[in-house]
Amino acid sequence: MLHTIKPVTNARKSTKRLGRGPGSGTGKTSGKGHKGQLARSGKTLRPGFEGGQIPFFQRIPKRGFHNFSQKRYALLNLKTLESFPQDTVVTPQLLLEKKIIKDQLCGIKVLSQGTLTKKLLVKASKFSKQAQAAILAVGGNIEVI
């Protein structure tokens, strides 16, 4: 029984043998054509290289500004907080454990999307005014860390 097992047709593709005579189809120049930069050894070119002319990404105009000192916050909405049981202390560590946020970045900011009906203690870096009001309105507490 075991001696009859074979791989599915075309499951194991044989490697292309280069430079093995004219009958092989890839003899002589081994599929590299004649001369030129790409026919030489070590032919790798960086992505976006256009043969020496000014590349497209340098030709188009640049716009805007990238603030390198910008702080990025992991965002958390009230509708996500609603999934926690009553009287839970919601901390960044708890959010990471439950995989609600992937990374703390510079901290966590709580936003007001959705509704909150449970009393919670929420520890975060920032709160929007509406989120803060919603948490306090249901008897919860906030703590800026």
Curated annotation (Swiss-Prot):
Pfam families: Ribosomal_L27A (PF00828). Residues 20-30 have a biased composition (Gly residues). One of its GO terms (cellular component) is cytosolic large ribosomal subunit. One of its GO terms (biological process) is translation. Residues 1-50 are annotated as: Disordered. Keywords: Ribonucleoprotein, Ribosomal protein, RNA-binding, rRNA-binding. InterPro entries: Ribosomal_uL15, Ribosomal_uL15/eL18, Ribosomal_uL15/eL18_sf, Ribosomal_uL15_bac-type, Ribosomal_uL15_CS. GO terms for molecular function: rRNA binding; structural constituent of ribosome. The keyword Ion transport does not apply. Belongs to the universal ribosomal protein uL15 family. NCBIfam families: rplO_bact (TIGR01071). Binds to the 23S rRNA. Part of the 50S ribosomal subunit. This is Large ribosomal subunit protein uL15. The lineage of its organism: Bacteria, Bacillati, Mycoplasmatota, Mollicutes, Acholeplasmatales.
